[in-house]
Amino acid sequence: MSTSTPLPSTPTGKHAIVYGGSTAGLIAAGVLSRHFERVTLVERDRLENGSQLRKGVPQGAHVHGLLTPGMNVLCEVFPGFREELKAAGSHFIDFTGEHAWFMGGFWRPRIPCGLHFYAQSRPLLEWVIRQRLQALPNVHVRDGREVTGFLTSPDKARVTGVHLRVPGGGQEETLEAELVVDASGRGSRTPQWLEALGFPRVEETHIQVDVVYASRLFRRPPGLVADWKMMSIGPKLPTERRMAVLAPIENDQMLLLLAGWHGLQPPLDDAGYVGSTRELIQPHIHEVIQNAEPLGPINVFRYSHNQRRHYERMSRFPEGLAPVGDAFCSFNPIYGQGMTTGALQAQALSECLRQGLGGLASRYRRQVGQLLESPWTMATSGDLRFPQVEGKRPPAFALMSWYSDRLQALVGHDEEALNTFVRVMQMVEPTTALFSPGMVLKVLTSRPTAAAMERRPEPPFAPTAAAKNQAA
């Protein structure tokens, strides 16, 4: 294991608490270990040794990709993390060079972009992070405990700790801290607890998506010689409501995710699940998995709505409290930005702590509010294309939808435009990069080439001798 993160020479504070052992919570705890003499991570689930699914992560059996900015944060907090994750079995996939990606009616050009999708199971990623975190001498993990409320100063202007207990009852105890980080996910009770303390109820934006995910593990088929590592087949919005992702994970396994919107649920029986891949707009995933060996059950996850809590808009908010990850903002997972956004929030918290604890809550909320704008806009703009989705469309939404369709066609054949699009998707550049004068000109004037229309991946399996003879 690589050398642990150096301890702070001049700590910002004595004790910080993170509650919620999500990836955002684990990263936040690692970040705080550099700023506080002592950090306590509280997690409701019992944390077992090894990479195992947790009850508190219902989406844990599905495709979880970490994007390049998220990996960069992890490597900053835990030096050598990239190498450790690779050694554990993660696949590092160039997002355009090694990713066969069909979207908007076109196969995207296959050119290296230097930005990666880090593919592994969610339990493996959590396990590797947790090992590094637990190696830090100033981090203590309290698993099998749930937080039931906040401790506050007499004037309720500052959160000073938490109440916690064993789930289901038992003796309650208190932990005091100078900073409490809520990483408890989209079901966070912070809005209710703040309201009970006399603070205004946080404004929330919900955008319904009603998407169902069904995922299953398969053994990598023998003889697979595909010229790609990962494949995504996405819908052409808003007329298509089905998509699929096939990604490699550890132990020579492949994870297939099928998704359907607004009542189009993937079949959950063995034959129906595999058979439904024939209905995808492209045949390649079906060709790979039709005879592949399944390695477990079909896991289902229903996601009802995007959810954003606008803590940055609150006129009054206690010091000593910072929500991160899904507790702040939860995106439709199909866009793959959730874990990376959580990591960037933890990084923002670290940057704000460099200025001390005074005024931290305001600085942090403002910075995260700005950070979320780009990924939130990208995720919700796609979801709002479906007429079934309830939610306020921004002004000129019809014009933006038209522009988006033209942009999708452009990145299907223009390598420079594709590179910009991916940099925005990976949160390296803001969404405004898609509206630069040069990009707008291309969107308005460019037309797909014949080569782009004919582009497709190579067959995933080498032809048999019989097939070669027949072709001859």
Protein language model annotation of sequence segments:
Residues 7-42:
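N-terminal Rossmann-like FAD-binding beta1-loop-alpha1 element of flavoenzymes
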Residues 31, 51-99:
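N-terminal FAD cofactor-binding segment of flavoenzymes
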Residues 45:
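Residues in the short beta-alpha loop(s) of Rossmann-like NAD(P)-binding domains
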Residues 65-66, 112-131, 183, 189, ...:
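Short beta-strand to alpha-helix junction loop
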Residues 103-122, 159-161, 258-261:
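Helix-loop-beta segment of a Rossmann-like dinucleotide-binding subdomain
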Residues 119, 252, 264-375:
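FAD/FMN-dependent oxidoreductases across multiple families
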Residues 135-276:
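Predominantly flavin-linked oxidoreductase catalytic cores and closely associated redox partners
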Residues 350-472:
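C-terminal helical "tail/cap" subdomain of flavin- and related membrane-associated enzymes
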